[in-house]
Amino acid sequence: MISLVFGDALARSFPFGSRTRNVNDLGNQFVPYHAHLWDMLHGEADGDVLVNWQSGYGSSFLPDLGTYLTSPFAVLVGLFPRDEIDLAVYVISVLKIATAGAVMAWLLRTVRTGPWWVAGALGASYALCGWTLATAVYNPMWLDGLIALPLLCLVGEWALARRRTITGALLVAVAWMANFYTAYMATIGAALFVIARLVIDRPAHVVTAVSGPPRGSTRTAANAERETAAEHPATEPATAADDAGPDDVGSDRGTPTVGLAGSPASAPRPSVPRLLGELWRPLVTLLLGVGLAAPLVSVIYAGTGEAYPGRDTEFVAEPWQDVFARLLPGGYGYNSPSLYVDTVALLLALTLPFNTAVPRRVRYGWSALVVAVLLSFQWKPTHLAWHAFTTPNGSQFRQTFVLCALLVIAAWLSLAYARPTWRALLGGGGVLAALTLTARDSQLLYAWSVPIMLAGAATLALALALWRFADARRRPVLVVLAAVLLVGMQVGQSAATLAVSDRKRLAHMDDYAPWGERQREQRAAIQAVDGWPAYRTEPGRQQTVGNDPMMVGGQGAQYYSSLTSDVLSRTMTALGGGWTSGGRSVQSLDNPVTDVIFSVGARLYSPPDPHQRWNPRHPGPVVTVRQKVPPLVTVRPPGPRPAYGISAYRNQELLLGARVYDVPSYTLHLTDRPQLPRTRDGGYRVPARHRAADPTAQVKAVCRPGSSVFLWAPRYWGKADLRDGRGPQADFRGDYPPKRSAAMQELGRTPANGQVRITLTALRGGSVPKGAIGCLDRGKLKAAADRLTDRGATEVSVDGATVRATVRAGSRGTAVVAMPNIKGWECAAGGSARPATSYLGLVSVPLDGKATTVSCTFQPPGLRGGAAAAGLALLGLVSIGAWRAWRARQTGRAPAGHPSTSAASHD
């Protein structure tokens, strides 16, 4: 924790300075989701655990809850004032990192006994690894995987010891529910750990259980384990004699060898296949735990199937010089594996192959495992296996914390058997020097990375010398000095590495302001006019983050999630909406037609966010505009179901049920060029304007005087303003190929002469499609809205995940609920419920003229199957508990010394 605080203070990062922490997903997703959780805990949210009514005009929330908010630490957000939401997320992140270090220290002491302060220091090395400092610190949900890995390794240890099956299964369930994505990677890492323990370390209790007690002995595996534990508490006994090399036998540096029955040859050594046969025990524990987590995991899995596909990414291996550079302090790279563990831990790990006090099988086996895992990062098939067979967008080495854990375990093994000699230190130092030499030309290193690494190596050598001298002279104060040196170097290196990461992230990632006066003003304005479910209140087009409705309130179209539904993204795109992040960050659409369609009765207009450097500086108050709109449930007349076309204007009219736009033909040319290249759909390609002297593009069209002029140009990046239209200059940010899409925007009113003249200042260029200009007749729109109101529901109520509406008697046609038809909605109109039908992407219910009520209830896909799996897992755990209770009673009745006497608690 000291390293984290010190590093953030060095970088002058929140909460210790003026620099924001909220980069990328931390600002866009994690802080807003925690704000929504705060609202839920305090009864102020619109929705429940199944439906979030504030985002995406109604989105499935349980998959988001499982993805972002089911960590046991997340509920701590409710203890903070809502205005301190950023501080709450920061404190939660720090607590997660500290917990990960503590659990790793526990695991190390379980693997083998050793000084508690060294275990604590190496636990901190793991918790403050490069993956944490460079990647996970702004993805707080991934920090649960940092805790899960050593926790699952402990569960594996218990399973091999035939202990704590129920506790282990419950901890597996907690880990998988906290964040299943990193728990999946942690499970792979824990599986490698358990296999290594069986094949390399061969724990005494497992060997005894597989081989049986020595001939003539009446001891059971459980008794052997208890006797061994009494001699060597909190660890497995050493087995160095079995595998000692010529220089190991008789050495006084290692822990004395204790056989399974008190002598080295008390039992025959089992074969590797027989040892691996014991894997069924941790496997059963894992399956029971994942089964308990199935209701959440299955919902998330189903949600990914319904999500907008986003962008395809191809895996590219990183240059080895950059990979090795990330082992050193101060290295930073967005898409390279963050392998840093402080130099103390790294050098100790590198001494393992050279530490002759460690049995050959242990030092070579664990070293080979570390190398194999590192190689798996750079090979596409194993890369895909690590990432659930999908190359992620963004960082492609999200499993790096597993390798950091293995490095720390290797460091512990090298020190726990016996402190490395000078020969081992020189061997490890030689490997470190070779790695540093390979990485010398990497652009990911700071100038001081190598000097601070050398300082760390020198500190370790000095601390080990002091420690050895203290043991020889019996001066414990020198041990304290050695500990202070080691821990001080760790704190300094990790703090410096974090400070570098904090600053470099801000240089190449989008960043967002923490909660401040802007959000307070918006939230107060929304609370003053909020009328849900009679109408929606839109937080507005000028967004602060990608999830403004969850941050400041209201019920908008804006929604950013890894699980943004395909139907929402495609529906809003068809209506002229904009998005970023490959379609998964849907933006608000400021349009009077869609406001009528989605029952938006109040809309906020805020000045551009001053935190973003590209925004114009137009300070001013937050303005709320009210309008009368149809209810949430409206009725369309009988007829064939319409289908969307190419034009966003015509698509809006289809959903509205009335013609309200004129879509004139137009011409577009540069001031010095009469002709521009055309697109295949009949539009124009607009070249980028690189200099102020470059020509602008002019658009000419004719519209009805007084009509509202809109421009729909999803692939255009630049500015647009309507001459004599008295409207503001509009910014468009659309890419091609489409990583983002620009939203349709209003430019102003058509002048009295009907001549529409639009100036395009192309910053990056792009294209303008055929039918890009729409001229809205507001009188026709009002008439259409009145008709929808007259035919719409007379009463609408929303209770959690259920919408109920009363429609007029004799209503025929289709009841349309103004929310996206995400999979899971079931509706009824006077009859039994059945899956909702789709009306241009919205939930709809057929009306036959007899029904007067319509009700729709949401149940996330995958919940039923997950609940069934959880029921079976729970039945399995209850059966195990009952069987243990029966065995305990039977054991209590058995005569003393009878062979059936065994520890039931170990079965």
Where are these regions (language model features)?
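Active-site-proximal, structured, solvent-exposed surfaces of multi-pass membrane proteins
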Residues: 30, 680-907
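Perimembrane helix-loop-helix junctions
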Residues: 158, 186-286, 460-465
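Extracytoplasmic/lumenal acceptor-recognition loop(s) of multi-pass membrane glycoenzymes
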Residues: 492-505, 527-595, 637-649, 728-732, ...
